Amino acid sequence: MAEEVVVVAKFDYVAQQEQELDIKKNERLWLLDDSKSWWRVRNSMNKTGFVPSNYVERKNSARKASIVKNLKDTLGIGKVKRKPSVPDSASPADDSFVDPGERLYDLNMPAYVKFNYMAEREDELSLIKGTKVIVMEKCSDGWWRGSYNGQVGWFPSNYVTEEGDSPLGDHVGSLSEKLAAVVNNLNTGQVLHVVQALYPFSSSNDEELNFEKGDVMDVIEKPENDPEWWKCRKINGMVGLVPKNYVTVMQNNPLTSGLEPSPPQCDYIRPSLTGKFAGNPWYYGKVTRHQAEMALNERGHEGDFLIRDSESSPNDFSVSLKAQGKNKHFKVQLKETVYCIGQRKFSTMEELVEHYKKAPIFTSEQGEKLYLVKHLS
């Protein structure tokens, strides 16, 4: 029989809905299901319910030891080759607690990060381009759960590529080839666009290009295998990759950046007159995350929000909220006729909006609570 996993509450949590469970700091709980970002647990009174996964931590030493072992096997520490992720039938100790229903421990597959990703929620995992993560769980909504550098969390699956059985050396070689491709032909190639930097950017590796806000650059290549990054040339001749959401295309698009075009104008977005929630002042339809960020930063106040169509899932939506320091984005899934955000379910989007005007949509570990105060105007 599988060993029961014990978790301990790191913070107090008060249930917001019937299917959730109140917990107290340092309370011991039994873990029943950890396949989502909210975990199902049982308390000493035999009551069960969902709690935020970042409010509890595992205290099961055998389970921790197994996780370390699985990670070592996957990374090949102390071995010439990595051990296959399929459990060895000759290892009954592993079989004794691998539960087929716990997807967290079923995968342990390496994947390589294609693009940088900054976590927006406390249960997400930040990604650094060029590093390797261990994929622990895959969900049908396009988000995967994995571990990197001792941290565990969710990230968008299209930011990584699976390398399965490829040895680490192959990946290093591919990075070398990628770098060589950037270095070669520095001063060749047609100018596709002239862009101006919206924000300063500091490179994290030799492939990328440093620039300051307002810098004008030529776009000379759009790598097909790296769609979020453009290859640009600065006026001093330096060439490298830049994140495309940090720049805007100049309107007149001169042939070279030696000209001095007028500063770019950001599009003014407004509530949508088409789409599922057309006519609602908070619905902005098909705008990008970047456009939402720009609008909230330019004319929003803390607590202002908008709802937009999801870029990654055609039938889903995102709530973008102006917050102190860093704006927040929350995914809303439409399952049949129900709108789901985390473990909470609402029959209409209007009901969801009204709920989070009264109840916090986000609570930090420090106790900071964020609400939907009013729609962006």
From Swiss-Prot:
Record PTM Phosphoserine, positions in chain: S85, S89, S91, S96, S166
Location of Phosphotyrosine modifications: Y105
Gene Ontology CC: cell-cell junction; cytoplasm; cytosol; endoplasmic reticulum; nucleus; plasma membrane; protein phosphatase type 1 complex; ribosome
Function of the protein: Adapter protein which associates with tyrosine-phosphorylated growth factor receptors, such as KDR and PDGFRB, or their cellular substrates. Maintains low levels of EIF2S1 phosphorylation by promoting its dephosphorylation by PP1. Plays a role in the DNA damage response, not in the detection of the damage by ATM/ATR, but for efficient activation of downstream effectors, such as that of CHEK2. Plays a role in ELK1-dependent transcriptional activation in response to activated Ras signaling. Modulates the activation of EIF2AK2/PKR by dsRNA.
Residue stretches making up the SH3 domain: 2-61, 106-165, 190-252
PROSITE patterns, per the entry: SH2, SH3
Subunit structure: Interacts (via SH2 domain and SH3 domain 2) with EGFR. Interacts with PAK1 and SOS1. Interacts (via SH3 domains) with PKN2. Associates with BLNK, PLCG1, VAV1 and NCK1 in a B-cell antigen receptor-dependent fashion. Interacts with SOCS7. This interaction is required for nuclear import. Part of a complex containing PPP1R15B, PP1 and NCK1. Interacts with RALGPS1. Interacts with CAV2 (tyrosine phosphorylated form). Interacts with ADAM15. Interacts with FASLG. Directly interacts with RASA1. Interacts with isoform 4 of MINK1. Interacts with FLT1 (tyrosine phosphorylated).
Domain SH2 as annotated: residue spans: 282-376
Keywords attached to this entry: Acetylation, Cytoplasm, Endoplasmic reticulum, Nucleus, Phosphoprotein, Repeat, SH2 domain, SH3 domain, Translation regulation
Free-text note regarding domains: Only the first and third SH3 domains seem to be involved in RASA1-binding; the second SH3 domain and the SH2 domains do not seem to be involved.
Organism of derivation: Homo sapiens (Human)
Modified residues (N-acetylalanine): A2
Locations listed in the record: Cytoplasm; Endoplasmic reticulum; Nucleus
Protein name: SH2/SH3 adapter protein NCK1
Modified how: Phosphorylated on Ser and Tyr residues. Phosphorylated in response to activation of EGFR and FcERI. Phosphorylated by activated PDGFRB.
GO biological process: actin filament organization; antiviral innate immune response; cell migration; ephrin receptor signaling pathway; lamellipodium assembly; negative regulation of insulin receptor signaling pathway; negative regulation of PERK-mediated unfolded protein response; negative regulation of T cell receptor signaling pathway
Principal location: cytoplasm
Molecular function per GO: cadherin binding; cytoskeletal anchor activity; ephrin receptor binding; eukaryotic initiation factor eIF2 binding; molecular condensate scaffold activity; protein domain specific binding; protein kinase inhibitor activity; protein sequestering activity
InterPro entries in alphabetical order: NCK, Nck1_SH2, Nck1_SH3_1, Nck1_SH3_2, Nck1_SH3_3, SH2, SH2_dom_sf, SH3-like_dom_sf
